[in-house]
Amino acid sequence: MSPSLFLGWGDDYFVVLWIHGRAVRLGRRQGVGRVIRVSLAMLILLALTFSPIVHATCVQTEPSTSANNGSWACSDQGEAFAKASSMGVPADLSVCRMKSIRAVSSGPGVFSQRMTYPGDTCGIGYDLDIGTGNATYPDTATCAKRPSQSGWTNPTAPTPSDVCNDGCYYTYAVDAGGPKGYTYVPSGATCTTDDAAPPIDDGGDGDDDGGGDGGGDGGGDGGGDGGGDGGGDGGGDGGGDGGGDGGGDGDGGGDGDGDGDGDGDGEEGGEGAPMSELYKKSGKTVESVLSKFNTQVRGTPMVAGIGDFMKVPSGGSCPVFSLGASKWWDAMTINFHCGGDFLAFLRAAGWVILAIAAYAAIRIAVT
């Protein structure tokens, strides 16, 4: 197939043009239309590279067909991985039973969507691994270059957890100086929401706080008014009952005095401090108490020491290994240890080893 700006099945040549800028390989005589298409493609790439928007939408550079999902230009590595992972099965290929679908790195700045069909379908006779679309990004705009985030809310609070945001994996890190007591740091690995849940946007905090304050103020005012009314009614009843009983019985003056004095004392009780002065609301909620407790516990020297012991000194990024393509296999990115069940297993194993060591230390100390 001859080289073209918008390729379908063999898009590697076009990718080389975008990464290395080798426009001279487009052909000897491109024509006015081809030059215009090249200029538009370069403008799109520059806009994605230097745009101030952190999370821009991927731009389609080749239209989709019934057999291919086309090509897309994205702003960074995470968005390109997420785009390639989200591509559906083309209509012409859905008649074959798909064995797997995935996004793989097919070179610097490129993720390709790959599908594998078993050999007993569509008359192929053998397992077939094909590409059905790709997403490109500037090779310097990696997940590791994204900034840390201190305004996100942990989706599994109060239990700490890592998150996946726009195709990039972020790890949970204790930050006593942050507004929430923790910060999310990009690990450099790609991910999907199957590996970790997305973070919760911080905009929801304002609504929660407003609701709590309103309820507290209403309760305080009601208590004060009730106390005042009760005292006034008590005094009136006491005076009436005392006078009536004393005059009628004669000898029963003792009863009259007793009733009068009792109700009169009740009147003084009604003039006491209203409820709003005896009780002042703190404004605390269950979530804020748990969050503060979690932050203070994690800031203690013992827990901080355990966290440092379990942390690999690799600069805050998960090591990701890449294996170039050959005639026998496709290019591979080995990053499964950076998230998901395998990462959870590694962490659990570390805590088990630490617990065994602590138990052994106690045995040595007491024997």
From Swiss-Prot:
Annotated TM spans: 342-362
Statement: the UniProt record of this protein carries the keyword Cytoplasm: no
Domain of life: Viruses
Main localization, broad class: virion
Residue ranges, compositional bias (Acidic residues): 202-211, 252-270
Stretch list, region Disordered: 193-276
Composition-biased stretches (Gly residues): 212-251
Subcellular location: Virion; Host membrane
Single GO BP term: entry receptor-mediated virion attachment to host cell
Entry's Gene Ontology cellular component terms: host cell membrane; membrane; virion component
Cell division in keyword set: no
Cysteine disulfide links: none
Keywords: Host membrane, Host-virus interaction, Membrane, Transmembrane, Transmembrane helix, Viral attachment to host adhesion receptor, Viral attachment to host cell, Viral attachment to host cell pilus, Viral attachment to host entry receptor, Viral extrusion, Viral penetration into host cytoplasm, Viral penetration into host cytoplasm via pilus retraction, Viral release from host cell, Virion, Virus entry into host cell
Membrane topology of this protein: Single-pass membrane protein
Summary of the function given for this chain in its UniProt record: Plays essential roles both in the penetration of the viral genome into the bacterial host via pilus retraction and in the extrusion process. During the initial step of infection, G3P mediates adsorption of the phage to its primary receptor, the tip of host F pilus. Attachment of the phage causes pilus retraction bringing the viral particle into close proximity of the host cell inner membrane. Subsequent interaction with a secondary host entry receptor induces penetration of the viral DNA into the host cytoplasm.
Subunit structure: Interacts with G6P; this interaction is required for proper integration of G3P and G6P into the virion. Interacts with G8P. Interacts with the tip of the host pilus. Interacts (via N-terminus) with host TolA.
Family the UniProt entry places it in: Belongs to the inovirus G3P protein family.
Stated name of the protein: Attachment protein G3P
Organism, scientific name: Xanthomonas phage phiLf (Bacteriophage phi-Lf)
